[in-house]
Amino acid sequence: MGVREKDPLAQLSLPPGFRFYPTDEELLVQYLCRKVAGYHFSLQVIGDIDLYKFDPWDLPSKALFGEKEWYFFSPRDRKYPNGSRPNRVAGSGYWKATGTDKIITADGRRVGIKKALVFYAGKAPKGTKTNWIMHEYRLIEHSRSHGSSKLDDWVLCRIYKKTSGSQRQAVTPVQACREEHSTNGSSSSSSSQLDDVLDSFPEIKDQSFNLPRMNSLRTILNGNFDWASLAGLNPIPELAPTNGLPSYGGYDAFRAAEGEAESGHVNRQQNSSGLTQSFGYSSSGFGVSGQTFEFRQ
């Protein structure tokens, strides 16, 4: 299977994470109806191909868009020139219908039919069943414009390969290499973009962010946190007046406690089972005052 030189996603200039997952109704109304009416698509994601001239495993490389499922507009080949039965012979095998047809409606009106088919390798009726599946969408009679015989000439097909549980474990070296390259490329790109975003943040120089790391509230409640480690911290600088920004009272509470200490109104209990500790923080880079936290055992 040939390798495409250019990435269709890059050429379409789509935002990261964008995927093409249309509903059955959208495929019929927004794409097939417009195709048979001669509408020009500004964003071409479904290509034209004579699907029955190829084996299904050759189709992904011919698609304009898609990763695990691929979409095509295909002429509807008939078995007999004046008949209505379609010709299902394709490449080295044939497509065989499975299940029952599904009527697709839009606003309560029947607009088309969805048919499921499975590809068999070899000649009918003794072909070997494969995991290649096709959903064929076609318009029904009253969806066609009067006097237009070309509306039945096109069908829209979705092609994909069904993966069984046993085959998920059996990955060929080529597939593994391709998946690893895709995963690493995506991860590297995402990591690079994250670094760019983080580098764009302003540097916050505030000593109050140098508090020792507390893994959980349980560490504090169990009395295992070393409050003595806070003694080595430099005093928190006084905040400059903020221009019209709201104050949440956290820093004021810290200053009030500091004033009480200077006046001798704060009594320290050294040998009690209870522990009260207050500390404040501020982030002047964002203009937000800190908060006062109190933990009791």
UniProtKB/Swiss-Prot annotation:
Residues 14-162 form the NAC domain. Residues 266-277 have a biased composition (Polar residues). GO terms for biological process: regulation of DNA-templated transcription; regulation of leaf senescence. One of its GO terms (molecular function) is sequence-specific DNA binding. Its main location: nucleus. It is found in: Nucleus. Residues 111-168 bind DNA. Induction: Strongly induced by drought, high salinity and abscisic acid (ABA). Slightly up-regulated by cold treatment. Not induced by jasmonic acid. One of its GO terms (cellular component) is nucleus. Keywords: DNA-binding, Nucleus, Transcription, Transcription regulation. This is NAC domain-containing protein 72. Transcription factors that bind specifically to the 5'-CATGTG-3' motif and with bipartite regions with 5'-CGTr-3' and 5'-YACG-3' as cores. Involved in the regulation of metabolic reprogramming during senescence by promoting the chloroplast protein degradation and the catabolism of lysine, phytol and free fatty acids via the induction of CV, LKR/SDH and PES1 expression. Also triggers the degradation of starch and the accumulation of mono- and disaccharides during senescence by enhancing the expression of AMY1, SFP1 and SWEET15. Expressed in leaves and in root pericycle and epidermis. Residues 168-195, 259-278 are annotated as: Disordered. Disruption phenotype: Delayed senescence. Reduced expression of genes involved in the degradation of starch and the accumulation of mono- and disaccharides (e.g. AMY1, SFP1 and SWEET15) as well as of genes implicated in chloroplast protein degradation and in the catabolism of lysine, phytol and free fatty acids (e.g. CV, LKR/SDH and PES1). It comes from the Eukaryota. Pfam families: NAM (PF02365). The NAC domain includes a DNA-binding domain and a dimerization domain.
